[in-house]
Amino acid sequence: MATPSLQLGSGNWAVKSDSLLGYKTIDSKYYPREMTFTRATTGTRVNAAGLVEIVPYNLFSYSEDFTNAAWFTTDVITVNTTTAPNGTLTADTLTIPSTTNAQYYLIRNSFFINVGQYTQSFYVKKNTYGYIALVSTINGSLQTSYFDINTGVVGTTTSGTTSSITDVGNGWYRVSQTANETTGANRVIGIYFANSLMNSINVSLSLTDSFYAWGAQLVEGTQPLTYLPTTDRLDIPRIDYSTGSSALLLETQRTNLALRSEDFNNGSWTKSGATVTSDSIVSPSGIQNADTITQSGGTLNINQTITISSVGNYTYTVYLKKGNFDSSTLFRFGAFQGGDLGYITFDFNTNTTSVISGTIISHSSTSLGNGWYRIQYTINIPAIGAVLFYNGGVGGSIGVGNFFYSWGAQLEVGPYPTSYIPTTSASVTRNADTCTKTGISSLIGQTEGTLYFQAKGLVDDSTYSLISLSDIGGANRISIGYANTATNLYFEYRVNSSYLINFNIGYIVKTDNNRIAVKYKLGEQAVFLNGVKIYSNTLSSAFTTALDRFSFDYNGGGFPYYGKVKALEIYTTSLTDAECIALTTL
């Protein structure tokens, strides 16, 4: 079989700060083909370890560009002066600017830190000076960790913080500091010159004193994690493992309207017959930031009142883990607006949800492992105004003294749940994902070709969801994907602005892991689904302008593809029927 001219996925994913790398293989070697990816916000994914994580998990932007305005410094910074730990000439020199006794630093100023534990880290190397400190004002007081980078030794550390230093070779060390934030506020975080006694960040040094720095990182949790370089942090593709294998996650724009999504002890949540112990257990993120909710008496209820600005379908989700109560105890989740709009129950014994009252549109539970479940229901909100969304035991009780664990509440407009969006004091929006590649006429067959993709849709609904090969204006185009009916594929073959083929075909469950291929050449077009040829035609019209772009939509004209894409392949030849059947067989 021919080799694809452009591939994505098939277990081989490479992500850059603002793009996704496709590839071509020649003699078992991979040659990158850079895709254009945009979202303009961060997002979350399920990583290879099965944990929910922020993408990117490095909370520092411009992690290797210390002259960027995101950083505030009193040092003299000379860029790209020495080889960094990754072998590139990208490490900077930080030099004392004055002999005056003072503090000299590279920091993030007024950097918002939510409640929880955080670890900052830098790669550092002695140039002419070898004493530095990591400093933060996490939790409202000065947290200082001193390091001797002449010999690789941790000095004194503020009580309540932990520090480490790791030799990474060639004189470089990775230094880290972990501190606990209990209130959530704007903080100072960064790296300072320290005195040689390692007991002060007020120093009087020579104008020639300097050290090298590279690779700043701030992450949630108590471990520094593998270094992840960043620029603006906004357009990083998400390779998701929620289905057990890797896939590119493409989602529509959604907003989490639930405030303090991980902090049920906050006043945004009203507690009845309940006490909350914050950050008491490891959450689905792998960080100790989930809460324990204990029934203290009366009726157990945790709720938040949210003002709804438009009527329609809303989806509520929350992560839940059983505590010490009898496993037969059911949990109740619902919405109230002048009366019960509807509620569901969740049974830990069977990992199932059930509708008890109201017009619940859909409901389900998903196991994340380690006893955690994500519970979801979709309900129609018939009027604007305040709606109370609640969690609690059926009958109002799980038993006084009994407890459960909770994390990650989310309310979003839409008929199905999307990936988790953390919030603090305000709602947060995750923008839609887009992925395109232009200027690739040489990679697309102009007189014949094949387009293949393997993907799993996010919802089985009546909405077009397409991928396309096209020219710049879309007058010549091949589109394939989900039709605007719940069970059909859509195939379009357009030449010189005329729709020569424009059909809903076949039968498909959009949320299944489907393999789809379309092949084309003069006198033959065909579509294959999961190992079966489901459509053929014999048109002989040639494209009037070159197809020069690929997009996960209708050539930029709407109908974006949202789902979990496991593979994409573009060929400059029309594969045989047997090859297409083999390619699409599950």
Role assignments for model-derived ranges:
Residues 103-109, 143-147, 155-168, 300-306, ...:
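Short, aromatic/His-centered strand-loop micro-motif at the edge of beta-sheets
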Residues 173-177, 185-190, 373-377, 453, ...:
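Carbohydrate-binding surfaces in secreted/extracellular proteins
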Residues 66-67, 124, 208-224, 264, ...:
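Extracellular, beta-strand-rich glycan-interacting domains
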Residues 1-5, 203, 218-246, 412-443, ...:
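Extended recognition patches within non-cytosolic domains
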Residues 188-211, 386-403, 537-564:
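Flexible glycan-contacting loops in extracellular carbohydrate-active proteins
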Residues 126, 178-183, 322-324, 378-383, ...:
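Localized edge beta-strand/strand-to-loop motifs within extracellular or lumenal beta-rich domains
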Residues 81-103, 280-301:
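Short carbohydrate-recognition loop motifs
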Residues 56-63, 70-75, 100-102, 112-116, ...:
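Extracellular glycan-recognition modules
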